[in-house]
């Protein structure tokens, strides 16, 4: 059993409450997903459960973890810097569990992930693996260690379709506890038996959470129905209040006018009117008490508001965007052949998606295409890499990254756009190393929007986006008036 009691998490820099009085009990066999908007604390919660020291630099935490005999394993959203320069063999041999496995067991583990046993002994550096291969390697090492609790932060990132199906089956077959975050609605719906929803309301000044033992689809449906019922009830009560207040105002004014015009020669009538006014005022006080008990208008987080591509992004129908031929595609070190006879043509506002298995060369191909298109003077191309840090200086703030001129009007405009993407005023001035993966992705997409690009080159653009933001991004890309070249699973 995994239990969390009265957990409170507050951001050290802006004192924003991320979680307040959070309580959770997970039992053997539970598959729990944490959902919520970007920057709502999903990754922070996973890190704290695994090791509170992982969040101590930026968050003040209080609460109790009760783990009992559970053995925890954690898959971070990104490969830690300390592991990037290690070879694949060094990565696996760093755990005793690797040497405790027989060659037969290692072979069986590798086969489950559609890898050869030689993968364990590779000399290739971890940071040169494809995004999907990095995730596979980390998952493999976790399974070798035989934990009882899996803490997985976006485990579906960069995985091909076959490996996504494997991940789904591994989660469903896991006999212990699984707690994970994911932007993949299909994975969530097919695996999760518990939904943990983290919300930040009132411009992220109020934290709220819900824990529901149900499927994600039913939770969303029931939540929408409850929201609609409460909204209707609150609106009905407010409508009745308006009618009641209007009637009360007429009564009050009528008695007040009568009192002001009563003759001194009619003391009995004056007394009756004063008694009536006393009753009317008592009625008003009763109404005030009733108003305090009215159903509150329900609140929920809204999806991000974002624009991608205006008139300047329109691509003429006949314009050749790429006519790309490549005899051979090899790994960056030139040692492994990935593909032969590649020929791609893209004209006008067409949308091109590159798919394939992990390690097939999708990112390598996209990088070469990006290098060509970014150098073209007849196009305005923008590139969003799989690794955001390739373009982002993590010590800079989002505002500084998006505008280096310092112009007040420009910065005001940028802050308005960031606000529409659910950034608080404080988050706009945080170093980007403190932002979540989804928030970093938002910064890059906003950079593309501000640049008036007419060609977007995107490597897994929806990774790290919440299930609420993901559909918005997909619809924006589909409606983009320029060309799009993208990798996606």
Enumerate the predicted regions with their spans:
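ABC ATP-binding cassette signature C-motif
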Residues: 1-230, 314-489
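Generic structural signal for residues positioned in beta-strands
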Residues: 3, 247, 286, 305-307, ...
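Extended, highly charged alpha-helical segments
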Residues: 89-109, 198-303, 407-409
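Coiled-coil termination/hinge junctions
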Residues: 295-321
